[in-house]
Amino acid sequence: MAAPASRQVRRRARAAPRPRSAEDWWWDRLAPRGSGYHLLQSDSMLLVLSEPGPARPRAQRRASRRTPRQPPRGPSAAAKPKAGLRSEAAAAPAPAPAPTPTPEEGPDAGWGDRIPLEILVQIFGLLVAADGPMPFLGRAARVCRRWQEAASQPALWHTVTLSSPLVGRPAKGGVKAEKKLLASLEWLMPNRFSQLQRLTLIHWKSQVHPVLKLVGECCPRLTFLKLSGCHGVTADALVMLAKACCQLHSLDLQHSMVESTAVVSFLEEAGSRMRKLWLTYSSQTTAILGALLGSCCPQLQVLEVSTGINRNSIPLQLPVEALQKGCPQLQVLRLLNLMWLPKPPGRGVAPGPGFPSLEELCLASSTCNFVSNEVLGRLLHGSPNLRLLDLRGCARITPAGLQDLPCRELEQLHLGLYGTSDRLTLAKEGSPFLTQKWCHTLRELDLSGQGFSEKDLEQALAAFLSTPGGSHPALCSLNLRGTRVTPSTVSSVISGCPGLLYLNLESCRCLPRGLKRAYRGLEEVQWCLEQLLTSPSPS
């Protein structure tokens, strides 16, 4: 029986304290005990916080988990062991007990509970700003009580998108799902959305009015409302919202079925503070534009009218001069994929005041439009601060008409034609007028589909090689798809524009095979330059 006893003694002797690991040494080196600092470690960061009551070192926390439970004291604990084992144990010397670190009093709540609430809210705010409040805040609220308290702060719920669950479901099931979601919103609105600023409703069909009523009661700070694919929006709901939310200044009604009377009533109530308005063109758009022409929204800065899925064959008649008088503060005007006609000014009528604050004009269209040099002059004759001009699909615009514009600091010019016109009627020369005027400020230039000759394009793009002051040109995006640009011209542009990050050479008949594609990024653009310098010229 001596062998088991000696084996037991050896086992106990091996229970000596382990040497400290390198991780524990660094842990104590970064935040020594008594220094007033403690470390908080997560999966991807290490925080050093100054706070009274430093955290326990890792070794002590691990030891507290490994400490065995003490046997209960009582009569049963004092029972005598077996006689054989007792005599053998008495013969062998008793080993010294292994020193175990004594853990500090109080449970280890974890690093997440030790972060101050205001810091945790700021961390959550960075994630919300990047990805939105959902689903992150909902998941974070389940981690612990401190995280739930931080995720419940109304300041984090400033931007919310509510999508109806009826997509892909039958109509009856969709109504039930909307009612169920509405019941949840009755609690969320007063408890989470009291500081809501931006709200988006997507594909709501039957419960739009109750939701807007809740918003008016619980969200006084609302500034932006978007209704996308929604039905049943009434005038009472919009007017009530305009009265309850005194800071509401932006309304997006694109792709929603809203009566023109409802929109006009809303603009009459909140028009004095309206800044941005998005609409989808329909037969009722004329009535809404009539309210804008009557100076209903004198502070309007952004106006966008686009075409819905079901294209309207009736062109929109837009009185340009009346719009300039009704919206003198307009900064962005977008008529996207819209067939519209400028209303004739009439004989003897003085030109309008223009848009002195206009910075962006977008008239892009994939269909036939009636935008000419004369119409463009009526729109932009008083806009010296224009930065973006998008005329894609406007085949009637010529370089001569663009040369007369008063803007001198244009940064983006899009003149691409995508198979919407006859190449025989396109201008063959005049592109140097554009680049010579704006070569010092242009960052994006789109000439795709234009019919300029090889020599004309060479002269136009050569303007970027001799910018005033000897500085590098600002050009970073160049679209030459379907043009007659030559390899030597492309090589010169790449060499003279070191900041070029996008170059589209698709369907360029004068370039060698294998190079007719789009290049994205500095490496691909430089690779294109190397290939052009080493490839033989096409026959």
Swiss-Prot record:
Residues 94-104 have a biased composition (Pro residues). GO terms for biological process: proteolysis; SCF-dependent proteasomal ubiquitin-dependent protein catabolic process. Residues 1-27, 49-111 are annotated as: Disordered. Disulfide bonds: none annotated. One of its GO terms (molecular function) is ubiquitin-protein transferase activity. LRR repeats lie at residues 177-203, 204-229, 230-255, 281-307, 312-337, 341-365, 368-393, 394-419, 423-449, 453-481, 482-507. GO terms for cellular component: SCF ubiquitin ligase complex. Coiled coil: none annotated. Residues 10-162 form the F-box domain. Residues 8-17, 58-68 have a biased composition (Basic residues). It holds the Pfam family F-box-like. Substrate-recognition component of the SCF (SKP1-CUL1-F-box protein)-type E3 ubiquitin ligase complex. Directly interacts with SKP1 and CUL1. This is F-box/LRR-repeat protein 6. It comes from Homo sapiens. The gene is FBXL6.
